[in-house]
Amino acid sequence: MFMSQIVDIRAREILDSRGNPTIEADVILESGVVGRACAPSGASTGSREALELRDGDKSRYLGKGVRTAVQNVNSSIHELLVGQSVFEQKALDEKMIAFDGTENKSKLGANATLAVSLAAAHAAAAEQKLPLFQYIANLRGQTTLTMPVPMMNILNGGAHADNTVDIQEFMIEPVGFTSFAEALRAGAEVFHSLKSVLKKQGLNTAVGDEGGFAPNLRSNEEAITVILQAIEQTGYKAGSDIMLALDCASSEFYKNGQYILEGEGNKSFTSNQFADYLAGLVKQYPIISIEDGLDESDWEGWSYLTSILGDKIQLVGDDLFVTNPKILQRGIDEKVGNSILIKYNQIGTLTETLDAIYLAKANGYTTVISHRSGETEDSTIADLAVGTAAGQIKTGSLCRSDRVSKYNQLLRIEELTKAVYRGKAEFKGLK
């Protein structure tokens, strides 16, 4: 007999990987089972993301405290959900959404609702003696579990680094392997090889928020070149074993209708010119995925980008779709992009996150489950990626325990499930 009633909900202020406060929530059941989860936090954020509630009191944590969000959990959300069955994930989330009553969760804070929503799923899984990935799979009747292809951010520019490179993330995707464990090993080897390539050139090998290197390279193409050298040095083949992926985070350098690349001598591009610039990179290098290639408001530009590259590579909407099913539906209707980045703190509940994932899947869009640049030891996204058979996961580089905790959880899950690693099957145009 399950004792699934929620008897207590508690939240506290903890620190994330950048030393900023975030919120951790515990959901406690009648049986004594405790589910715990933490909310992550982003640096480059889409303007339509759900609101992360911060205190704004400059005398504490430079205004970044989350005491208000903690109080919202310990009072309003506590009153709302105590006494409910933890197995009613959708009902629990809908109660919080209805009570909040705003489009962007600005009353309770998406950091408050998300921490509770995920903690409830952890508690429910523990009460049923199920691994979290299996509980998540059961929520939507997902019968096939797969191991995701990792999108590894090994070189940083843009808002994630203090350097002259405009594109925010240069990533590798180890597609030519038969297991997640082997893919992870290849990624780690390339990461170490990249460090030695940079060292040889007298470049900085300190790492950024997500564990990637942020050397002072002269241009975006130079960043691609050093990664290709690192892949070659490890004995892998770029274009078959390992593909490249970019996150342009274009909204960060979109000013007055122009894309301005400071690292390229302040060159400015119109939407179509920048889309053509990206198409040129795809032609020249083994790039399989581009995220946020254009600004979140530039739907016309996105439409053109999709028309020239959409049948060749993955075009991921992050700031564009902000994990929001309504905005994703517009993208589907207008044939914009062909993939969605899933960041659950952009929307604020597990239920709405699953809605976005399954809407994407039903319409032939790939799904990439993602961390944020401000992370904790919480590894829920690893279970989410497997439990929804998402296909890909983006959780940073191959160092820093806030990133590696997700990879390690995926290794445990692979050992337990023997789930198939997606590899090349995940991508258009890869055989």
From Swiss-Prot:
Listed Pfam families: Enolase_C, Enolase_N
Organism for this UniProt entry: Acinetobacter baumannii (strain SDF)
ATP-binding listed as a keyword: no
Similarity-based family: Belongs to the enolase family.
Chain positions recorded as Mg(2+) binding sites: D247, E291, D318
Coiled-coil residue spans: none
HAMAP family membership: Enolase
PANTHER family: ENOLASE (PTHR11902:SF1)
Function per UniProt: Catalyzes the reversible conversion of 2-phosphoglycerate (2-PG) into phosphoenolpyruvate (PEP). It is essential for the degradation of carbohydrates via glycolysis.
Enzyme class: lyase
Reactions performed catalytically: (2R)-2-phosphoglycerate = phosphoenolpyruvate + H2O
GO cellular component terms, semicolon-separated: cell surface; extracellular region; phosphopyruvate hydratase complex
GO biological process terms, semicolon-separated: glycolytic process
UniProt-annotated location(s): Cytoplasm; Secreted; Cell surface
Record-given protein name: Enolase
